[in-house]
Amino acid sequence: QYTANVADECSDWNDYSKWERHGITNTHFYDVMYMPDLNLYVRLHLGGVDIDTNKSLSELGDSRVLYLMLFDHEFNIVGEYKLKEKTYNYFTGWCTLSNGLLIFKDNALSELTDYDGSQFDIYRVH
């Protein structure tokens, strides 16, 4: 397992700079999605990063690692995979298929991003 399946609680909700720091340094979990042909659930999540004062919050955010986690019908973890770094859009640029996941390839830090067309990877689960 690459990351903990929980995120730390933010210590100060009244200070926006602490909230931003918390958002970058902690794991972020996305919605759980269902793949009906496999009777499995899939969830993407971002790993946290250390704050580097030489980089913008945007650059730090786009450099986070994206993970794919699979769950069985009782939500037991059956797999976790580290996806290609600096490749995918972290703002809901994906959708489930009946037997996999489609993820758009448009990370701002990628030199291969084609903004004139759509590029994506399909991760099929067997």
Locations of the language-model features?
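Recurrent small/Gly-Pro-centered beta-turn motifs in extracellular repeat architectures
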Residues: 44-47, 105-107
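Beta-rich catalytic cores
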Residues: 28, 64, 89-90
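Blade-level signature of beta-propeller repeat domains, shared across WD40, Kelch, NHL, RCC1
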Residues: 98-126
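Surface-exposed loop and turn segments in beta-propeller and other repeat-based domains
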Residues: 1-24, 81-89
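Beta-propeller blade signature
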Residues: 56-76, 115-126
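Residue-level recognition of short loop/turn positions
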Residues: 37-38, 74
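Short secondary-structure capping micro-motifs at structural edges
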Residues: 14-21, 26-33, 52-58
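Structural signature of eukaryotic scaffold interfaces centered on beta-propeller domains
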Residues: 24-37, 94-98, 102-103, 107
